[in-house]
Amino acid sequence: VGLGGAGFPTYVKYMKPDGVDYVLINAVECEPYITADYRSVMEDAADLVTGAKIMKKMAEAKTVYICIKESHPDLIEKVKSALNDAAGVEVRPVPDVYPMGWERVLVREVLHKEYGGLPAEAGAIIGNASSAIAIAKAFEKGEAITQKNLTVSGECVKDPHNVCVPVGMPVSEIIEACGGYTQDTVRLISGGPMMGKTIVNDMFVVDRAMNALTVLPAANDDAIACLRCGKCSDHCPSGLQPVRITAALKANDVDEMSKRGVMSCIECGMCTYICPSHIDVTENVRKAKRIVMLKKK
């Protein structure tokens, strides 16, 4: 599986590489708190470059761009030093804005192209930095993915750290190793604060796609009625109108949900973050997506 968070199978991207000119290696990590890929690249820059070369060959691409936030000049220099004049592999600094890590925004920023369904339509394959490192270790050393780098952070964990843990390790043990919780009632998120999923308790295990554990104060259910201010629509990177999708959800109007482009939502969390009524808009849109998908089945 890919290690970028979605767990999309890496091999699928390289099955039909016709027309692919670029491979973009995503080391952006635009979500707050998360620095697991940063730590991985700092420690394994040589493997990252080796993985980039392998991915370039698999995709039969002309150029590989290793995309890193401009706010990490130390990481940029580290990777540039590891390149050692590697042919067709370049470091591409990108702005530190959210959601720069989303593949559509990354393609727009680096290649100045738009596409409909998949990045291959713009002549690109997107791969995560940790995936590139794992590919290098698999090819050179025959190593399987048995460990995962995670960022354990947030206001309610005593000793936040980037940790390397075995896949399948209980989250409760990881939290304990980081000093435990700072208060009795917390909000535990698998992932980052914007796109992560809130988990009821810490009785679950690490999988290969997990990149962070975020521990925040328990959310107060202080939502009020929608003000119809339109901020969720103004800030949606996919150009959707979450307020109208939510209205369609409440009316159970599946055709309207689909018409409003609900399946284009990337669940970035921006609409929930910006909502002055403190409504979990992202969860409403997520529910609408599930309903549309079930109807298609």
Whereabouts are the PLM-identified features?
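Hydrophobic alpha-helical positions that pack around
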Residues: 61-171, 177-181, 192
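Active-site gating/interface segments in enzymes
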Residues: 98-101, 105-111, 125, 179-227
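Ferredoxin-type iron-sulfur electron-transfer modules in oxidoreductases and energy-metabolism complexes
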Residues: 210-223, 233, 237-297
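Fold-independent oxyanion-binding glycine-rich loops
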Residues: 3-6, 10-12, 25-29, 36-38, ...
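Conserved active-site and cofactor/substrate-binding residues in soluble primary-metabolism enzymes
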Residues: 18, 43-50, 59, 74, ...
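Iron-sulfur-cluster electron-transfer modules
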Residues: 1-65, 70-86, 94-102, 228, ...
